[in-house]
């Protein structure tokens, strides 16, 4: 397997196996991190999540679309230092609307069916993160990069 294919395979496996991610935004130079339920596109070019429009994260990402998304496989055990994989996705975020929104919600709710009422609430927004780069960390310090064209 080519190195790029191996990275993509590991990224896809991690995105499919994990339900939660941390989205980092910022305002006025002050970083802010938020836990979100997410789904990735099959080609790994986008990460999607739903948030209420009244949240700090929504306010921050509408002012500055640059975001980082952290997804990891840690289990809060000592073995995580050797076994866990983390990826950081660097990209830009925007709210999506119909008709794209309907298609994304189908994919999102297939992974998170318990969030159906929340996801369809008029007070919530579906956010798309367009990935520019992925940074994968394994074995605590082995870093691999994948840049999305």
Name each model-derived stretch.
Residues 58-62, 147-149:
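A short, polar/proline- and glycine-enriched secondary-structure boundary/capping micro-motif
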Residues 51-55, 70-76, 104-115:
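Short acidic (Asp/Glu) patches
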Residues 18-53, 61, 68-73, 81, ...:
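Short beta-strand segments
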Residues 6, 76-80:
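Short helix-coil transition/hinge motifs at the ends and kinks of transmembrane helices
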Residues 1-21:
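Extreme N-terminal tail/first-helix region
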Residues 17-18, 63-64, 111, 132:
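Structured helix-beta-strand junction loops
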Residues 2-3, 82-149:
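Charged, gly/pro-rich active-site loop segments
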Residues 16-18, 31, 121-122, 130:
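Short gly/pro-enriched beta-turn/loop segments at secondary-structure junctions
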């Amino acid at each position: 397997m080519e190195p790029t294919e191996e990275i993509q395979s590991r990224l896809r496996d991690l995105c499919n196996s994990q339900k939660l991610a941390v989205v980092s935004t910022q305002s006025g130079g002050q970083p802010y991190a938020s836990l979100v339920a997410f789904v990735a596109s099959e080609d790994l070019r986008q990460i999607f999540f739903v948030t209420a429009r009244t949240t700090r994260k929504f306010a921050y990402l509408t002012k500055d679309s640059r975001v980082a998304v952290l997804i990891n496989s840690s289990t809060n055990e000592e073995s995580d230092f050797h076994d866990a994989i983390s990826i950081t996705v660097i990209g830009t975020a925007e709210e999506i609307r119909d008709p794209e929104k309907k298609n994304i919600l189908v994919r999102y709710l297939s992974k998170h069916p318990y969030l159906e009422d929340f996801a369809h609430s008029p007070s919530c927004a579906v956010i798309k993160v367009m990935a520019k780069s992925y940074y994968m960390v394994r074995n605590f310090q082995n870093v691999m990069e994948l840049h999305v064209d």
